């Protein structure tokens, strides 16, 4: 039985993600050393790299060079936008992003800074050190455990706010970054989690979609060593809770960066105007935060 709020719940089986909210990454740049390939192939390649990076998590200390090279390859084939202009108000600061530098893959994970001296970076949040986790003779390895946290989305208080778009970001990129930075998996469940409302009505009651009868909520899942899993879940909860608190658009720097990224992906980003107003080149229909779910290309 799942508990609401921020309580930990052990799960015997991994929760399989629903295809209705899994948006693929897009916008990859071609490597000068690789022949051009269709976007679907590049997206598939990056997905495989991210999966391999997650599997290598427990072996950072014994295979640091492999992890470092894999991180460089992920960064090379991806085209995540420059986030160095996030101001104080961006939730990514809570994930250890430097205040005056780019958010790159070698600095995304706070835990990676503890596990791999090659990737060490300063972070305001430090979980328990995994020294003794693996590769240290004479010390027992902590067991791998699975925990899930449920966060209810306050749609009753803010019925017109597009929380799903805020969490996913342009083409799902924001959610991917959160998962990579926290080593947790994030699932959007409940009423309103399906982009197509007509399709959602058809899916209600079918096996695997029982959650559509529940209020909109977010599940944060982690399967990690017992001595570090709570700290990583806390990082994910802290970040996602900040996204579930609507704020004035003039102060919402996170939304502003997402809008810029969306414009860049659509090829409509122009030079910034000296006016402090929010990117005039972006039409309201392009915003992932409109009351109606922004259309997302697959």
Curated annotation (Swiss-Prot):
Keywords: Nucleus, Phosphoprotein, RNA-binding. Residues 274-288 have a biased composition (Low complexity). Residues 152-219 form the KH domain. The keyword Phosphoprotein applies. It is found in: Nucleus. The modification Phosphoserine is found at residues 273, 287. Residues 266-298 are annotated as: Disordered. It comes from the Eukaryota. InterPro entries: BBP-like, KH_1_KHDC4/BBP-like, KH_dom, KH_dom_type_1_sf, STAR_dimer. Transmembrane segments: none annotated. This is KH domain-containing protein At1g09660/At1g09670. It comes from Arabidopsis thaliana. The lineage of its organism: Eukaryota, Viridiplantae, Streptophyta, Embryophyta, Tracheophyta.
């Amino acid at each position: 039985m799942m508990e609401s709020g921020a309580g930990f719940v052990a799960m015997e089986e991994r929760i399989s993600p629903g295809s209705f909210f899994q948006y693929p990454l897009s916008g990859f740049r071609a490597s000068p050393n690789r022949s051009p390939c269709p976007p679907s192939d590049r997206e598939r390649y990056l997905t495989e790299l991210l999966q391999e990076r997650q599997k290598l998590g427990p072996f950072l200390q014994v295979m640091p060079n492999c992890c470092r090279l894999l991180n460089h390859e992920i960064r090379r084939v991806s085209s995540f936008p420059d986030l160095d202009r996030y101001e104080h108000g961006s939730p990514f600061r809570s994930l250890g992003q430097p205040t005056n530098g780019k958010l790159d893959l070698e600095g995304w994970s706070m835990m990676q800074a503890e596990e791999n001296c090659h990737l060490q970076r300063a972070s305001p949040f430090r979980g328990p050190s995994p020294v003794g986790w693996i590769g240290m003779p004479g010390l027992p390895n902590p067991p791998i455990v699975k925990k899930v946290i449920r966060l209810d989305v306050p749609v009753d208080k803010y019925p017109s706010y597009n929380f799903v778009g805020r969490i996913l970001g342009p083409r799902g990129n924001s959610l991917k970054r959160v998962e990579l930075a926290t080593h947790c998996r994030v699932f959007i469940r409940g009423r309103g989690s399906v982009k197509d409302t007509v399709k959602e009505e058809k899916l209600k009651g079918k096996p695997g979609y029982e959650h559509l009868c529940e209020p909109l909520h977010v599940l944060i899942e982690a399967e990690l060593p017992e001595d570090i899993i709570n700290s990583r879940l806390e990082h994910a909860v802290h970040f996602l809770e900040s996204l579930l608190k609507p704020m004035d658009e003039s102060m919402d720097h996170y939304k502003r960066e997402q809008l810029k990224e969306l414009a860049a992906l659509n090829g409509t980003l122009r030079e910034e105007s000296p006016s402090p107003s929010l990117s005039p080149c972006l039409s309201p229909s392009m915003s992932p935060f409109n009351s109606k779910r922004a259309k997302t290309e697959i």
